[in-house]
Amino acid sequence: MKFMIGLMSAAIVGLAGAMPAHAETLRVGMECTYAPFNYRTPEGEMAGYDVDVAKGIAERIGVDLEYVCQEWDGMLPALLASKFDLIVASMSITEERKQKIDFSIPYRVSLGRILGAKDAGLKLFDDAGKPNPEAFNGLRFGVERASTYAKWVEAKLPGAEIVLYDGAQPMLLDLQNGRIDIAITNPMKAYLDFLSKENGAGFEFVSPPIDEVEYFGPGVGVGLRKGNDELLAKIDKALEDMIKDGSLEKYSSKYFPFSIQPSGWKGVGE
C-alpha cells in the first residue's frame, strides 16, 4: 500500500468540493503536533496512534492517504470547507459536534484529568468524585482552547480563573514553571509527556478520571462531513475489524503502557 504523505498547512490546501465515498485518496486532517497521537518525526514522517488508525482504515477500505496539518480550533471549519475529508485527530464524539458532522464508532476512550503540584495539598473533589467549586477559588486553571475540557470547566466551574492555551505542551510548561496552578488535559498524554519525565516529578493527578458523556462523549472517533454514508459505513466496518483482530490494541501498545480502548463497542459482537 502506497501512502501519499502531504504535510501541508490547511491554509494552503485550497481544495473544494465533497470527496465521494469511492475516492482513491482521502485527505486526513490532524494537528501534526499532538504526540503521541499524531505528530511529525524529526525525519518529517507522520507517526502516532491516530496515524496508525488512519493507515489501518486506509488499508481495509483500499484508499491512499494525504495528511493535512490543521490547528485544533480550526479543525471543524476546515472539514466543513472541504479542505480535507476526514478528521483523525483524537476528536471526542460529542452531541454538539454531531450537529455539524458525522462520526465513526469510537476507536479510543475520551476523558480528562487535572494535574497539580504534589506539595500543594489540593483536594478539589469530594469522595463521590464530584468537583467542589469553592476549592478551585484562587487557582489559575490551564485549559486547552476549544476543547471538551474547556466545555466541562465552563459548565462545572463557572467561577474558575481560566487561562487558555493553544495546546497541551505550552500549558504543561507553564504548570511546571508556576504560571498556572492546575491544568486539565488528556491523562495519557500527560503521563507520557510530563508525569513520567524528570520535569514532571513534582506533579500528580489531583482529580479522578473525568469522563462525563455529556461533555466527553462515548469516545474518540473519525469525523467526516454529513452525507457520506457509504464512506462512514466502510470506516465503521474497518474499525470493527481492527477491534476484533486486535489491531487497535496493537497500535496503542506502541505508545501507551495501559489500555486506551473503550470497554464496549457499538456493533461489535452483535
Language-model segment annotations:
Residues 23-91, 99, 245, 258:
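Extracytoplasmic small-molecule ligand-binding "clamshell" domains
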Residues 51-52, 67-77, 128-129, 162-177:
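Short helix-initiation/N-cap motifs at beta->coil->alpha
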Residues 52-60, 119-127, 139-140, 147, ...:
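Extended ligand-binding regions for polar small-molecule ligands
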Residues 62-64, 81-89, 139, 158, ...:
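Alpha-to-beta junction loops
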Residues 63, 92, 99-154:
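A conserved helix-loop-strand patch within extracytoplasmic ligand-binding domains
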Residues 64, 144-157, 202-205, 236-270:
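Ligand-binding clefts/hinges and TM-proximal coupling segments of bilobed small-molecule sensing domains
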Residues 74-77, 91-99, 154-155, 181-216:
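A ligand-binding cleft/hinge motif common to bilobed small-molecule-binding domains
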Residues 109-113, 195-236, 258-270:
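Periplasmic-binding protein-like
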